[in-house]
């Protein structure tokens, strides 16, 4: 039962119909139309968001059993799939009076990937990589499903885009097949231009989707439909079964991209599965921002806004990772006596178990990203990205210390006062104490002293033989974004670090002045003053805190 709050307005758009619960209202606007179904724009009154209303006329479906089977297959699959690269299903029902079958899915603002690519002729190779990686992640999920799922009709017409987010998702699963055990599929079905050679032999497995994926990437790169030089399906069949690639394949100017597409279009015995293709160098980012999923930005902002109010994050299906199994909130508290900041993390799992973790945060030496990486490793957090956690921490610190964001280079923190990485010898590692209410022991977490990160280099240099070997946070912790260690990139990173250090000099001096002022105030108030030495005791750092413990 939903309570409707309405307001009088002449500009409001009336619903053509609503679902049985009254939650979803359909408009007349048609988003797309196929041979079997029509997709309308609709509105979800509970979440306050636009959705896609898929409608099928049952009279048309019942003319033959095949369309009915396709419809059932699509809805049944969507109800059981849950992945960020697969179109999200909401609900379905049959309208007996109108003789229609209806189901609600998420809305895509920019249509299909084919329409989107034809609309925007100039697309950077980094965008192609991002789209390809999202699609391949979706295929890896489908093929790794239990039992495995084959799409069988993957093409740019069946991939949908949210252009303002850089997000693509796989849809139209009406032709998908579920492989039971180790059996292969045995029906010829799909779109000829995207069908693998073995499909015509009626004996194939999930690798046919990899072939179709390669054709999708080919279309993304060239903007041309595969085998557009052919005038009929018979010509396409002859080329495909003889192993001849489309003419557009030879138009690819990017060498690595052409090699990658060729890998996807190999014969089935040499074709790699989705999980292995994800590790291909073509999809690896040379810059950590190359493949940054732009659609995650609204998620981070939403998390920050909720965490700022100390609210446990609710994972709405429209904004969060559907594979996530825990809720997390981070709140900060400042000690008014010594101005030490303590952060409290609450983690709620799917079984209702709550973990409370408290630890100090030193605004002069700690960075949100370092702390987030520690948390991910030591608390064994697998369903949260370190950057998301870092954004929550940064938001809390900024609320407690408003000027901190300006005096700190945000998540990409640079410390001024040490040499470059190549000049650094052995450095002392700091440790932080995470205390969890759900465990009987405290876990010390080591952090590297060197905060020297650049925008292109988040992996610490582990070649230094003098580096301490007892640090728990080793290089494997940082491998959430690839980097290239050639001489040119190393020189560029050194230049970036030097520039950032120079820019942070003024901010660093501001921090020093602020600290000196606070020490003077505390001294006059009689806080932190040692009468034996007639000196002011410094503000305790994370290391001092641990030693006292």
From Swiss-Prot:
InterPro entries linked to this entry: Kinase-like_dom_sf (IPR011009), Prot_kinase_dom (IPR000719), Ser/Thr_kinase_AS (IPR008271), WNK_Ser-Thr_kinase (IPR050588)
GO biological process assignments: photoperiodism, flowering; protein phosphorylation
One Pfam family this sequence matches: Pkinase
Molecular-function GO terms, alphabetical: ATP binding; protein histidine kinase binding; protein kinase activity; protein serine kinase activity; protein serine/threonine kinase activity
Bias (Acidic residues): 452-463
Deletion consequences: Plants display early flowering and altered expression of genes involved in the photoperiod flowering pathway, such as ELF4, TOC1, CO and FT.
Residue numbers carrying Phosphoserine: 504
KW Disulfide bond (keyword) present: no
Keyword line: ATP-binding, Kinase, Nucleotide-binding, Phosphoprotein, Serine/threonine-protein kinase, Transferase
Protein kinase domain span: 25-283
Top-rank EC class of the record's enzyme: transferase
Active site annotation, chain numbering: 172 (proton acceptor)
Disordered: annotated segments: 414-490, 525-549
Keyword Lyase: no
Biased composition annotated in UniProt, kind: Polar residues: 531-549
PROSITE patterns given in the database record: PROTEIN_KINASE_DOM (PS50011), PROTEIN_KINASE_ST (PS00108)
Catalytic activity: L-seryl-[protein] + ATP = O-phospho-L-seryl-[protein] + ADP + H(+); L-threonyl-[protein] + ATP = O-phospho-L-threonyl-[protein] + ADP + H(+)
Binding annotation for ATP: 105-108, 155
UniProt EC number: 2.7.11.1
Ranges of Low complexity composition bias in the record: 467-476
Annotated function: Regulates flowering time by modulating the photoperiod pathway.
Family the entry assigns: Belongs to the protein kinase superfamily. Ser/Thr protein kinase family. WNK subfamily.
Subunit field text: Interacts with AHK4.
Protein name: Probable serine/threonine-protein kinase WNK5
Organism, as annotated: Arabidopsis thaliana (Mouse-ear cress)
């Amino acid at each position: 039962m939903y309570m409707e709050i309405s307001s009088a307005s002449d500009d409001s758009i009336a619903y053509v119909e609503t679902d049985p619960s009254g939650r979803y209202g359909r408009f007349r606007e048609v988003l797309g139309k196929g041979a079997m179904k029509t997709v309308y724009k609709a509105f979800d009154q509970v979440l306050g968001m636009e959705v896609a209303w898929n409608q099928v006329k049952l009279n048309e479906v019942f003319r033959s059993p095949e369309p009915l089977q396709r419809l059932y297959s699509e809805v049944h699959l969507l109800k059981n799939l849950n992945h960020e690269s697969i179109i999200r299903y909401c609900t379905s029902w049959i309208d007996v009076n109108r003789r229609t079958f209806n189901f609600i899915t998420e809305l895509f603002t920019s249509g299909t990937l084919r329409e989107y690519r034809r609309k925007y002729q100039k697309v950077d190779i980094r965008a192609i990589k991002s789209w390809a990686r999202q699609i391949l992640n979706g295929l890896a999920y489908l093929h790794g499903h239990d039992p495995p799922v084959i799409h069988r009709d993957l093409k740019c017409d069946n991939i949908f885009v949210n252009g303002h987010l850089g997000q693509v998702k796989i849809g139209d699963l009406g032709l998908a097949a579920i492989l039971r055990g180790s059996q292969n599929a045995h029906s010829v079905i799909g779109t000829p231009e995207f069908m693998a050679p073995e499909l015509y032999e009626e004996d194939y497995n999930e690798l046919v989707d990899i072939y179709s994926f390669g054709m999708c990437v080919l279309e993304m790169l060239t903007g041309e439909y595969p085998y557009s030089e052919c005038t009929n399906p018979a010509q396409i069949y002859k080329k495909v079964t003889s192993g001849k690639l489309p003419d557009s394949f030879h138009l690819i100017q990017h060498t690595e991209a052409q090699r990658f597409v060729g890998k996807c279009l190999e014969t089935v015995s040499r074709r790699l599965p989705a999980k292995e293709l994800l590790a291909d160098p073509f999809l690896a980012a040379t810059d950590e921002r190359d493949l940054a999923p732009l659609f995650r930005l609204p998620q981070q902002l939403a998390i920050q806004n909720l965490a700022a109010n100390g609210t446990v994050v609710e994972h709405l299906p429209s904004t969060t990772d559907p594979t996530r199994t825990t809720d997390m909130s981070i709140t900060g508290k400042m000690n008014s006596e010594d101005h030490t900041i303590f952060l409290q993390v609450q983690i709620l799992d799917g079984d209702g178990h709550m973990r409370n973790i408290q630890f100090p945060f030193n605004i002069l030496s700690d960075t949100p990203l370092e702390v987030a990486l520690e948390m991910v490793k030591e608390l064994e957090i697998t369903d949260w990205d370190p950057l998301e956690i870092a954004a929550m921490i940064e938001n809390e610190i900024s609320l407690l210390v408003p000027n901190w964001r300006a005096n700190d280079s945000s998540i990409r923190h640079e410390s001024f006062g040490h040499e470059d990485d190549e000049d650094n010898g052995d450095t002392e590692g700091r440790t932080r104490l995470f205390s969890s209410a759900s465990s009987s022991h405290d876990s010390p977490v080591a952090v590297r002293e060197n905060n020297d990160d650049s925008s292109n280099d988040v992996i610490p240099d582990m070649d230094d033989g003098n580096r301490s070997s007892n640090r728990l946070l080793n290089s494997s912790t940082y491998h959430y974004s690839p980097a290239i260690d050639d001489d040119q990139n190393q020189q560029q990173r050194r230049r970036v670090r030097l520039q950032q250090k120079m820019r942070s000099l003024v901010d660093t001096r501001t921090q020093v002045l602020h600290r000196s002022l606070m020490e003077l105030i505390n001294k006059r108030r009689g806080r932190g003053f040692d009468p034996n030495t007639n000196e002011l005791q410094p503000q305790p750092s994370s290391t001092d805190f641990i030693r006292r413990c």
